[in-house]
């Protein structure tokens, strides 16, 4: 099974390390040389070079040139883990199995931006690590793998991120054989249960001391 990976954040790097470790046929990687958008940005090319994996720096992943580069690799499936823009239909149609994306929330609930930060700020006690088949919507495609996790009172943004990554890497190792054998299942999302989280801004982080102590704590996590 030939795989292309698209990504440019810390989780993308950890996923790339996992794919290499379990000897996946990784035929290409698309990443960014720099980013002012993602605080957890990582350039995947150095690791690709060490392991002789073809790597392309891209800005607009949906450009005709980049779509053709991916097409020429003839992937069976594309993994998009950690990309800040929507993947459009030209790339969605390239691989027979489509594009698998990732969202650390219990889809169909809590689609959209900054899911881990929103979960902490709102004081959620649980969420989920979700891989899904991407479509033209935002986090709306069929679910491939979903694992629940607890959010403890002690969790902050850093250790919650680490916790979710470890869960996601186990999921990757588990669902890849199912993709290879064609034994995976697709679970449609229930639109009646869905909601969307917006992009956070500076005002969302302001502390109002009329808030409860718990609410203030949640903002500082």
Please annotate each region the language model reported:
Residues 1-221:
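One-carbon transfer enzymes
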């Amino acid at each position: 099974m030939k795989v292309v990976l698209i990504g440019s954040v810390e989780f993308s790097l950890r996923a790339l390390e996992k794919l290499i470790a379990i000897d996946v046929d990784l035929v290409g990687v698309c990443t960014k040389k720099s980013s002012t958008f993602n605080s957890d940005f990582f350039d995947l090319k150095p690791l690709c070079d060490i392991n002789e994996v073809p790597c392309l720096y891209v800005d607009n992943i949906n450009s005709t040139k980049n779509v053709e580069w991916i097409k020429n690799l003839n992937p069976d499936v594309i993994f998009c883990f950690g990309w800040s823009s929507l993947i459009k239909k030209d790339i969605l149609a390239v691989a027979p199995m489509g594009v698998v994306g990732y969202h650390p929330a219990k889809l169909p609930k809590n689609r959209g931006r900054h899911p881990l930060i929103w979960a902490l700020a709102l004081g959620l006690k649980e969420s989920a690590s979700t891989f899904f088949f991407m479509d033209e919507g935002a986090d709306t495609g069929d679910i491939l793998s979903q694992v629940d996790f607890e959010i403890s009172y002690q969790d902050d943004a850093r250790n919650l991120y680490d916790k979710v990554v470890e869960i996601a890497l186990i999921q990757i190792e588990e669902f890849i054989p199912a993709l290879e054998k064609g034994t995976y299942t697709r679970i449609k999302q229930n639109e009646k249960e869905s909601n969307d989280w917006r992009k956070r801004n500076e005002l969302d982080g302001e502390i109002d001391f009329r808030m409860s102590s718990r609410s203030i704590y949640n903002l500082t996590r």
